[in-house]
UniProtKB/Swiss-Prot annotation:
Primary location group: cytoplasm
Name of the protein this chain belongs to: Probable D-xylulose kinase A
Family: Belongs to the FGGY kinase family.
Function: Highly specific D-xylulose kinase which participates in the catabolism of xylose. Xylose is a major component of hemicelluloses such as xylan. Most fungi utilize D-xylose via three enzymatic reactions, xylose reductase (XR), xylitol dehydrogenase (XDH), and xylulokinase, to form xylulose 5-phosphate, which enters pentose phosphate pathway.
UniProt source species: Emericella nidulans (strain FGSC A4 / ATCC 38163 / CBS 112.46 / NRRL 194 / M139) (Aspergillus nidulans)
Catalytic function, reaction form: D-xylulose + ATP = D-xylulose 5-phosphate + ADP + H(+)
Protein EC: 2.7.1.17
Keywords tagged on the record: ATP-binding, Carbohydrate metabolism, Cytoplasm, Kinase, Nucleotide-binding, Transferase, Xylose metabolism
InterPro entries: ATPase_NBD (IPR043129), D-XK_euk (IPR042024), FGGY_C (IPR018485), FGGY_N (IPR018484)
Annotated ATP binding sites: W373, G480, G481, N484
Class of enzymatic activity (EC top level): transferase
Induction record: By D-xylose, L-arabinose or L-arabitol.
Example GO molecular function: D-xylulokinase activity
Highest taxon in the source lineage: Eukaryota
Length: 581
């Protein structure tokens, strides 16, 4: 799908790409931050020759989820073709940056540099680069095959809290370090033949450069290998990850990491000049992870929160405080030294909501309704908060995990509870006693996802003033789910937001937009000018955001504050039952 703005084109243009799980997007912006062209390649709908579902392949026996790298090559040419057909004059494009699904690794073979450098403009990327990889697949963030390796990582420095303090996160299935450790044990010969290892973000930059790009200063923090305090790879963790192949070999495979997120990596390869008409002076800027790119989609203030409602549910904040905890993530900020990105990420986001949505439609014998969310929204709004028709009723709450979850670390499953806040009594309802299913689950799943965010971010928020309790100043919603005003309303009731809940107008393209803004900043900044200063001066709030729900409401916020206590107990109960702590 492609579209363009009717705005007149003046001055330089910048492209931001978003290589996500299910599609590749390209957004073109001008210096005033206006989107003037966009092109999207949907992997399931538009690709040819790949038996994928929702952008990935799965090996259920080993809990593997992965994507064919060649699919992404096909997608890039198609997105550029789409922009060309719209009439984009690529010679006006001054800079390129991108966003890649975080943690995914790409394994380059011995001929990678030669093949990248020798790209022929008369042929497509897929045809020329399929032989550039030692391994044809990239692990996806939904992969959960690395529990053994995660245990090794968590233990290696003396516990999950020590690993989180050093690298910003405890070990997680999707993180690149545990994935590389498993890869080198499972495929030792392939690992030996691997010349370089890229993250998805640096893979994207490599395609434009015609040689292997360095890893990004923010995205590298999603590996469990980068020591944030030292600003370097952690030698002990490299030793664990490399195993018998050696630390120096792994260092060569990973390469150096520039500290400046806006550094000039080089000019675009002649393939793009000859095939699409790019200027030979077009500059490639480091691509970053999809989550770091999302916080660049607006000049986010430290007192604001973003909730990304995509395939996963993600909570993001920019903060000068580094308060590592095994339940959360800290990354270097993608553009601004001295700031960190705080993140909570859950596998069971949009897919989990869709499962309950479909069950509600099925219960009403509506298999393909014109608006698939209408019944879900109606039922969720009709259900009182926490299913309480009166204050003396127990609070209904649950965990809804169609896939194994990260936080808390649990198998796939569903658990329903009734919680009495007056006594602290928590009772599991094994057969859904007292629940009207699936109707009650519509509100309950939104509440479950938002209560988890409030529980885990409560130590990082502060009072906006007066008698208002600690909470974000604003809650910004991005991603596909940001269009749903029912979710927005309930999010505001739970998370607060003293100034309200807002939708970024191009919310489902936030990653590509953030990448494009990163390119604008990198090439138009004055000496020592921060991203927030440059983008903040050009960002016209009324054009980019819309207030879609009230935030803080005293009574609701206090009721959900009591629910947070029950929610924390519920998680602990399930973890104990499942033998995980």
């Amino acid at each position: 799908m492609s579209s363009r703005s009717s705005s007149p084109l003046k001055g330089p243009l910048y492209i931001g790409f978003d290589l996500s799980t299910q599609q590749l997007k390209g957004l073109v912006v001008n210096s005033d931050l206006k989107v003037v062209y966009s092109s999207i390649f949907d992997f399931d709908a538009d690709s040819q020759g790949f038996p994928i579902k929702k952008g990935v392949l799965t090996n259920e026996a080993e809990h593997e989820v992965f994507a064919p790298v060649a699919l992404w090559l096909q997608a890039l040419d198609s997105v550029l073709d789409g922009l060309k057909k719209q009439g984009l004059d690529f010679s006006h494009v001054r800079g390129i940056s991108g966003a890649g699904q975080q943690h995914g690794s790409v394994y380059w073979g011995q001929d990678a540099e030669k093949l990248l450098n020798g790209l022929d403009a008369g042929k497509r990327l897929q045809e020329q680069l399929e032989g550039a990889f030692s391994h044809p697949y990239s692990p996806n963030w939904q992969d959960s095959s690395t529990q053994k390796e995660c245990d090794e990582f968590d233990e290696y420095l003396g516990g999950a809290d020590k690993l989180a303090e050093a690298t910003g996160s405890k070990a997680h299935h999707r993180f690149t370090g545990p994935q590389i450790l498993r890869f080198q044990k499972k495929y030792p010969d392939v690992y030996k033949k691997t010349s370089r290892i890229s993250l998805v973000s640096s893979f994207l930059a490599s395609l434009f450069l015609g040689h292997i790009a360095p890893l990004d200063i923010s995205d590298v923090c999603g590996m469990n290998l980068w020591n944030i305090h030292k600003g370097a790879y952690d030698e002990d963790l490299l030793k664990l990850c490399a195993g018998p192949h050696g630390v120096e070999d792994l260092k060569r495979k990973l390469g150096d990491v520039p500290e400046d997120g806006g550094i000039d990596l080089g000019k675009v390869h002649r393939y793009y000049v000859d095939r699409y008409g790019f200027s030979p002076e077009c500059t490639v800027i480091p691509s970053t992870g999809d989550n770091p790119a999302t916080i660049l989609a607006l000049p986010l203030r430290p007192s604001d929160a973003m909730v990304s409602l995509g395939t996963s549910t993600t909570f993001l904040m920019s903060t000068p405080s580094y308060k590592a905890d095994p339940a959360t993530h800290f990354f270097n900020h993608p553009t601004t030294p001295g700031l960190y990105m705080f993140m909570l990420c859950y596998k069971n986001g949009g897919l989990a909501r869709e499962k309950i949505r479909d069950a509600i439609n099925d219960a009403k014998n509506e298999k393909n309704p014109s608006n698939p969310w209408a019944n879900f929204d109606s039922v969720a709004l009709q259900t009182p908060p926490l299913g309480q028709t009166s204050p003396s009723d127990p609070m209904k709450m649950g965990l809804f995990f169609p896939r194994p979850e990260i936080v808390p670390n649990l198998r796939a499953g569903q658990w329903l509870f009734n919680y009495d806040p007056s006594t602290g009594n928590l009772t599991e309802t094994l057969n859904g006693e007292g629940w009207n299913r699936p109707a009650d689950e519509a509100r309950a799943i939104i509440e479950s996802q938002m209560l988890s965010l409030r529980l885990r971010s409560r130590g990082l928020t502060s009072s906006p003033g007066g008698d208002i309790p600690a909470q974000p100043r604003r809650v910004y919603l991005v991603g596909g789910g940001s269009k749903n005003k029912t979710i927005a309303k309930i999010a505001g009731e739970i998370l607060g937001g003293s100034e309200g809940v807002y939708k970024l107008e191009i919310g489902d393209n936030a990653c590509a937009l953030g990448a494009a803004y990163k390119a604008v900043w990198a090439l138009e900044r004055k000496k020592d000018q921060t991203f927030e200063d440059l983008i903040g001066a050009r960002w016209h709030e009324e054009e980019f955001i819309e207030k879609i729900a009230d935030g803080y409401q005293k009574e609701a916020f206090e009721r959900y504050g009591k629910a947070v206590e029950g929610f924390e107990k519920m998680e602990q109960r399930v973890l104990e039952q499942e033998g995980r702590k």
